UniProtKB/Swiss-Prot annotation:
Gene: lgt
Record: residues binding a 1,2-diacyl-sn-glycero-3-phospho-(1'-sn-glycerol): 139
Species, as recorded: Nitratidesulfovibrio vulgaris (strain DP4) (Desulfovibrio vulgaris)
Metabolic or biological pathway: Protein modification; lipoprotein biosynthesis (diacylglyceryl transfer)
Lineage of producing organism: Bacteria, Pseudomonadati, Thermodesulfobacteriota, Desulfovibrionia, Desulfovibrionales
Keyword Secreted annotated: no
Family statement drawn from the similarity comment of this UniProt entry: Belongs to the Lgt family.
Protein name according to UniProt: Phosphatidylglycerol--prolipoprotein diacylglyceryl transferase
GO annotation terms (biological process): lipoprotein biosynthetic process
General function of this protein: Catalyzes the transfer of the diacylglyceryl group from phosphatidylglycerol to the sulfhydryl group of the N-terminal cysteine of a prolipoprotein, the first step in the formation of mature lipoproteins.
Chain ranges passing through the membrane: 10-30, 56-76, 91-111, 117-137, 171-191, 199-219, 231-251
Length: 263
């Protein structure tokens, strides 16, 4: 059994101001996406400029924060927030939905494409490889908060989480860090380094993320307010991943978009 590192969720205190690790992880995620986007925009043949990447990050931040929070409220705990509306704005305590954030980013990419005369899939293919670092840092934030832990386990790397009872649990946040953060990033970055048919980079992102998240959900404790939705094992996270997997397969289908462009 591994010892859970008890890290103060407050990273920096400046007088009355407190900066939490959870919020800093989002900052690190946005900065990494900005840096990677700038690097890719500077490559020969890119249709993107540094200024477009700057605009993209602004749009994405709004999409992630607003979409992620609204998605969590609607998908996971609507009754609680209807009873406690003042908690809607307490995002520093956690409570963000990837799927809601993704919908927010999709809308942001549509707006960005319209502004710059780019097709939606052109924007999506450029942005997709920049997302996994944000997922990596986000799951680190979940781990520091001691939230979203997994089911009980006897495996040697099981951990006793502060609010997870006396028995070791899967550190499912770290599983997602590795799969959705590291492996997904490497796969997308390498895949998109060559010219691909329009939509294929986005399709690979949707497919791999959906498969990785669907798999980890089997060892992740379901949200207590929802539990299992069906069959004694199906979670809300898995339900929300099914459309992503199907979308990814459709975008990657043989004979799809014939246009070949650099991401």
């Amino acid at each position: 059994m591994l010892t859970f590192p008890r890290i103060d969720p407050v990273a920096i205190t400046l007088g009355p101001l407190q900066f939490r690790w959870y919020g800093l992880m989002y900052l690190f995620g946005f900065l990494s996406g900005w840096w990677l986007g700038r690097r890719r925009a500077a490559q020969p043949g890119s249709r993107w400029t540094g200024e477009m990447v700057d605009d993209m990050v602004t749009y994405v931040i709004l999409g992630v924060v607003l979409g992620g929070r609204i998605g969590y409220i609607l998908f996971y705990d609507l009754a609680y927030y209807l009873s406690n509306p003042t908690q809607i704005f307490s995002i520093w305590n956690g409570g963000m939905s990837f799927h809601g954030g993704l919908l927010g980013v999709v809308f942001a990419m549509w707006l960005l494409g319209r502004r710059n005369g780019l097709g939606f899939m052109d924007v999506s293919d450029f942005v997709a490889p920049l997302i996994p670092p944000g997922l990596f840092f986000g799951r680190i934030g979940n781990f520091i908060n001691g939230e979203l832990w997994g089911k009980h386990t006897t495996l040697p790397w099981g951990m006793v989480f502060p609010d997870g009872g006396p028995f070791p649990r899967h550190p499912s946040q770290l599983y997602e860090c590795a799969l959705e953060g590291v492996i997904l990033f490497l796969a997308l970055w390498v895949f998109s380094s060559r010219k691909r048919p329009t939509g294929h980079v986005s399709g690979l992102f949707a497919l791999l993320y959906g498969v990785f998240r669907f798999t980890v959900e089997f060892v992740r404790e379901p949200d207590v307010q929802l539990g299992y939705l069906a069959f004694g094992w199906l979670t809300m996270g898995q339900v929300l991943c099914l459309p992503l997997i199907m979308l990814g397969l459709w975008l990657l289908r043989p004979g799809g978009d014939k246009g070949t462009k650099a991401a």
